[in-house]
């Protein structure tokens, strides 16, 4: 039986929250799922929030995703060169999308917590 499609940001969040050490939070004032133990966001609304969501992942993986499934995985100029890729809702391969959300969580969980920002 194949996985149901991820048709909305809420579907992506619901799946991400089934992963270990995750919590619903915000990033840049918008909803996001973070790794609890280090406070880093790995899934977020992104700038194309009506048609996609974003995940944090390494640059090499992003290039492979864009080459092998450009209908699902893409970057706008805002994200190019950064470890972030956008994922269109209702992908033809929802299992791969879930796998990438899991990999994003694992990749982000391996990072140290961000340094505190100075308040102005």
Residues covered by each model-derived region:
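Charge-dense, helix-prone N-terminal extensions
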Residues: 1-120
């Amino acid at each position: 039986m194949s996985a149901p499609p991820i048709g909305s940001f809420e579907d992506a969040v619901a799946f991400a929250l089934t992963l270990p050490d995750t919590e619903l939070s915000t990033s840049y004032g918008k909803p996001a799922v973070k790794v609890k133990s280090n406070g880093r966001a790995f899934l977020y609304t992104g700038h194309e929030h009506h048609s996609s969501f974003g995940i944090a992942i390494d640059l090499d993986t992003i290039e492979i995703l864009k080459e092998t499934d450009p209908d699902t995985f893409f970057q706008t100029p805002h994200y190019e060169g950064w470890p972030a890729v956008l994922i269109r809702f209702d992908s033809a391969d929802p299992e791969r999308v879930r796998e990438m959300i899991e990999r994003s969580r694992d990749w982000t969980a391996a990072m140290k917590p961000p340094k505190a920002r100075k308040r102005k």
